[in-house]
Curated annotation (Swiss-Prot):
Protein family per UniProt: Belongs to the SIMIBI class G3E GTPase family. HypB/HupM subfamily.
Organism: Synechocystis sp. (strain ATCC 27184 / PCC 6803 / Kazusa)
Record flagged with keyword Repeat: no
Function: Involved in the maturation of the nickel-dependent guanidine hydrolase GdmH. Required for nickel insertion into the metal center of GdmH. Seems to be required only for GdmH activation and not for activity.
Protein name listed in UniProt: Guanidine hydrolase-activating protein B
Keyword list, A-Z: GTP-binding, Hydrolase, Metal-binding, Nickel, Nucleotide-binding, Zinc
Residues involved in Zn(2+) binding: 95-96, 131
Amino acid sequence: MHQSIDTAIGLNLLHANQAGADHNRAHFDEWGITCLNLMSSPGAGKTVLLEKTLAALQSELKMAVIEGDMTTELDADRLRQYGSPVIAINTGRSCHLDAKMVAGGIHRLQEDYNPKEFDLVLVENVGNLVCPAEFEVGEHSKVALLSVTEGEDKPLKYPVMFQEADCLLITKTDLIPHLDIDLEKLAANVRSMNPHVTIIPVSAKTGEGLDTWFSWVKSQVKVPMIVSI
């Protein structure tokens, strides 16, 4: 009985969140913004990837960041150095951002900026391999990060995030010489559950794969149609 009640409550929460996510996405679509949701376990490299992305693409794209952490604005402060607006959201005990939280972030962005000026909103979700994948926030694409130190079996143990991802970044590849890891096996494990995912090995330290990542990001951004009169 209790299990049935818990299941019903969980489904209601997911349904309500999905409605909120659809509402957020409708706003993004109205404004011509692409939203990417970055997800990973803690320490996989989301923040440093965003630093590299903001630095590399700021002359080409107008970007904003919604930065999720349980507490502090440490990561948000790091990202603010690159000049793009960064909205920090502290989730408290929650292990993920949800659509309502991100809606609040959108409203805060609207207070100081015209959202139609932006091309891209990058959401850095709370570090967790499970919860963020189950709660959409209004994104157009999900980006998962997995560091080589986590092993090639992680996608099999925590499948939902890797099943949902549109792009997987295998991070910290500069550490491979010091580890016993098989990248081909890792990629095969991911493709066994998500055959169409884009997989990009990257190293923020050496720069490996970053240009490929930047190209993928730009390929996702909505390009306004120019109508000739």
